[in-house]
Amino acid sequence: MFGLTTKRILTLFTKKRQTLVEQKLTEYMIAGEKTDNQMLHFKLQVETATPTLDQLNIMLSNIGKDKSDLLVAGATSIEDALTKYQHDNQLFRRPCLVDWDKGKVSPYSILLQTRDFSKLL
């Protein structure tokens, strides 16, 4: 509205601050401020806490039922992932990048193998 653009919010769930993943995403965020490329306009929110149950439910829905083990260790389905997570939230696999606006989830296995983070955005 009124010519204003809102930035997408990306949340990086990580165990500690200042990881390589966070540094790379920050570089892309800064680069995005200097370009007209709307794909690079985002706000990075870094969370060292595990996601809420509601957040995890959204993430699992976006990643798909067959890939729930990418977010929760040992999970065989969305329901199983939620149950395991309720009993032990440390089963959540980090780092994990979530683009809430686009419904994209990049689990740890993808983040740790990615050299070009712009492909995740």
From Swiss-Prot:
Transit peptide range? Answer: 1-17
The UniProt entry's GO CC annotations, sorted and at most eight, read: mitochondrion
**Can you tell me which residues the record assigns to a coiled coil?**
none
Active-site residues, record numbering mapped to chain: C96
Read off the Gene3D superfamilies from this record.
Glutaredoxin
What EC number(s) has UniProt assigned to this enzyme?
A: 1.-.-.-
GO terms of molecular function: oxidoreductase activity
What is the disulfide pattern of this chain?
none
Top enzyme class: oxidoreductase
Q: Which InterPro entries match?
A: Fmp46, Thioredoxin-like_sf
Q: Which UniProt keywords apply?
A: Mitochondrion, Oxidoreductase, Transit peptide
Location relative to the cell: Mitochondrion
State the function annotated in the UniProt record. Putative mitochondrial redox protein which could be involved in the reduction of small toxic molecules.
Q: Which family does it belong to?
A: Belongs to the FMP46 family.
Output this protein's name: Putative redox protein fmp46, mitochondrial
Originating gene = fmp46
